[in-house]
From Swiss-Prot:
Catalyzes the conversion of dihydroorotate to orotate with NAD(+) as electron acceptor. GO terms for cellular component: cytoplasm. This is Dihydroorotate dehydrogenase B (NAD(+)), catalytic subunit. Its EC number is 1.3.1.14. The lineage of its organism: Bacteria, Bacillati, Bacillota, Bacilli, Bacillales. It comes from the Bacteria. Pathway: Pyrimidine metabolism; UMP biosynthesis via de novo pathway; orotate from (S)-dihydroorotate (NAD(+) route): step 1/1. It holds the Pfam family DHO_dh.
Length: 304
């Protein structure tokens, strides 16, 4: 038996580690450095119905223990991704999780109805942190009713399991998770970035042209651990955890908190080899901690 294997809806993972969406493109650049078949899965870059140029620059800023970004979901659009990006990934056995974003409910439905046309795509990650342009720009993921309705609409058309990515910029993460689960979501991914800002002392203005950006990296890990633990306390829904993963101990901390698998984001920019490194280090660290397999760790967590 593979002691690192994880089985969650649509995804048979040889190990629990994958690159997070937005930090890995569509895999072509990283494939020059290592075999993508080593990965548990790949969370591809966000896709919208039409191409998007993203936000004006500067749109990235370094922070203590992390970074801010306001890329603005820059991507070549659904048709290009189906024709040129996903076919490249079909050569690998690694399951692909397609990240889907939009400005309206119709945008999400349009992409989710078709993204499964690629045989590489085994699941969808629904990015509900996007602003809803028909409701004053409030993010889809901050209102339980809106999140429920969007999840249900997508589940009606999706041909693969749907995982919904939770925003941490909410007062009650549990109520959002419960609303999404009630709508039929197959799983959750959590957490997305926290809203942040940096000021340039010389210009007296925000460094990010957009004003604010998403804070990621080690700074947000305690928030991610807390939120995953809160959701796991009330639900058995599959969770892919993320937010500040740097080390193999971080991976295990996420799994013990309640995640079934773990995604690595910002660290890919610091060390392109971070995912295969963590995968190779995980068995030894499990031995040191007396963890026979991830399946046993999950049972232990359930019995606590």
């Amino acid at each position: 038996m593979n002691r690192l294997a994880v089985e969650i809806p649509g995804l048979s993972l040889k190990n629990p580690i994958m690159p997070a969406s937005g930090c890995f493109g569509f895999g072509q650049e990283y494939s020059k450095y290592y075999d993508l078949n080593e990965l548990g899965a790949i969370m591809a870059k966000a896709v919208t119905p039409e191409p998007r140029l993203g936000n004006p620059t500067p749109r990235v800023a370094e922070t203590a223990s992390g970074m801010l970004n306001a890329i603005g979901l820059q991507n070549p659009g659904l048709e290009h991704v189906l024709a040129h990006e996903l076919p490249f990934l079909e050569q690998f056995e690694t399951p692909i999780i397609a990240n889907v974003a939009g400005a309206t409910e119709d945008d999400y439905v349009q992409v989710c109805a078709r993204i499964g046309e690629s045989k590489a795509v085994k699941a969808i990650e629904l990015n509900i942190s996007c602003p809803n342009v028909k409701h004053g720009g409030i993010a889809f993921g901050t209102d339980p009713d809106v999140a429920h309705r969007l999840t249900k609409a997508v589940k009606n058309v999706a041909t693969v399991p749907v995982y919904v990515k939770l925003s941490p910029n909410v007062a009650d993460i549990v109520s959002i998770a419960q609303a999404i689960e009630a709508a039929g979501a197959d799983g959750l991914t959590m957490i997305n970035t926290l809203l942040g800002m940096r000021i340039d002392l010389k210009t007296r203005k925000p460094i990010i042209a957009n004003g604010t950006g998403g804070l990621s990296g080690p700074a947000i890990k305690p928030v991610a651990i807390r939120m995953i633990h809160q959701v796991r306390e009330v639900s058995n829904i599959p969770i892919i955890g993320m937010g500040g993963v740097q080390t193999v101990d971080d991976v295990l901390e996420f799994l013990i908190a309640g995640a079934d698998a773990v995604a690595v984001g910002t660290m890919n920019f610091t060390d392109p080899f971070i995912c295969p490194k963590l995968i190779s280090e995980l068995p030894k660290r499990m031995d040191e901690l007396g963890i026979s397999s991830l399946q046993e760790l999950k049972k232990e967590r359930a019995n606590q």
